[in-house]
Amino acid sequence: SRTPVSRRSVVRLLEQAPSSALKFFDVNLRGRYYDAGLIREFLNYADVFKINDDEILTVRRLFSLAGSDEEVCRTLLAEYGLRYLIFTAGENYSVIYSPQARSYLPTPKVEVVDTVGAGDAFSGAFVYGILTGKTMEQAHRDAVRVSAFVCTRPGAWPAYTPDLKG
């Protein structure tokens, strides 16, 4: 939300979303367009929160949180009543936390052509998996596979191979 108008619009949409809707918040910190208040406000609406290994440093500072990345993730998960917290560490690994479980997967080694869109592909595949009844672990595996594939193609919207669809 880069302007007060867009922020109010997003909040209005979140308030009107059915309680059954899965509300996803990718913190996606850019420039000067965020502060602790904005992040907290959207976390209060979120069911799923995605943060990467760079963004967690900023959130840790803004929220005055101490501890390891895992401790910060678990604190946010509990404090905001999230169903899932997705933590991505680029070419190294990703972890998805729920109140009851943790799913850790190393990032597959692929010939990287372009990383643009990999995070969004990860998010989309994970949410799709959850919404279609997959377990957190199954949805996580799909998310890792799809995002790795995206990295092997130029551009953010590569044509998916049949084995990646559904």
Language-model region placement:
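Ribokinase/PfkB-type carbohydrate-kinase core domain
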Residues: 1-102, 134, 164
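Conserved post-catalytic alpha-helical subdomain immediately downstream of the catalytic base
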Residues: 80-84, 106-166
